Amino acid sequence: MTIALTDKNTLRETARKNVDQGAVTEGYDADRQEVLRLLNDSLATELVCVLRYKRHYYMAKGVKAHVAAEEFLEHAGQEAEHADKLAERIVQLGGEPDFNPDSLSSRSHAEYKPGSNLKEMVYEDLVAERIAIDSYREIIQYIGDKDPTSRRLFEEILAQEEEHADDMADILEGL
């Protein structure tokens, strides 16, 4: 059985067209503007999560605060890595990552809820992770096979968000 792939000469010729579009080739099937919007909204979500986790790290108090604070700091770093990867993908697709602090909160899937004590902080972090999980699942479904690179990026981030939610659920149970 022979698979019908594009012949080499056609691939070479097509690759020379629209070179100014970088990684976005004629074979890109997704609605690029919509994917860029989803990536930028997810970038806002990750940045809001970084800020919330950082605040919680510094504000955690109580007998069991040490364990939670370590998780808050670790998660803040991982959320920042997610933001960096999303920003890189936005640029690869010819967009501009939106780091505007004035609109972060309104574009973020999750809200910035500071919490007034350790239990509320952990609870709000768990809620935010659950929101991110559902948002990223929907984005993965929407993208499907039209943009495998963005889909894989969201799948990687989703896996870590699920770990974060599990961590927060464990800590909350112990409070």
PLM feature spans:
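Iron-associated oxidoreductase/ferritin-like identity signal
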Residues: M1-L175
